[in-house]
């Protein structure tokens, strides 16, 4: 696969297949963020933060991307690169929706 094919495969996943299965990234990542927040605060009560640790949908996108980076570090599978591109796109869309400036 070349880079264009990887990006096209990621587009098919995040704009079609996966969205049909799991809903929009914003909604799905919000659900994951809420679950991770509860889990992490219960698991690591003295987390060094003031108050409750809050995981956001953008954090979910970045942590899922890091999971793919970890997998790529031990096994080069095209699917992991496709997923990495997809998580980056979803994270970018969420960030822009939150008001991050867009370079044009």
Each model region followed by its residue ranges:
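Intrinsically disordered, low-complexity regulatory regions
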Residues: 1-104
């Amino acid at each position: 696969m070349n880079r264009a094919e990887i990006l096209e495969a990621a587009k098919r996943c995040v704009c079609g297949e996966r969205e049909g299965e799991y809903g929009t990234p914003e909604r799905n990542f919000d659900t994951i963020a809420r679950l991770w927040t509860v889990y992490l605060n219960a698991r690591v009560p003295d987390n060094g933060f003031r108050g409750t640790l809050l995981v956001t949908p953008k954090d979910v996108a970045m942590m899922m991307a890091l999971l793919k980076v970890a997998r790529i570090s031990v096994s080069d599978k095209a699917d992991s690169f496709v997923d990495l591109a997809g998580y980056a796109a979803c994270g970018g869309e969420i960030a822009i929706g939150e008001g991050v400036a867009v370079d044009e």
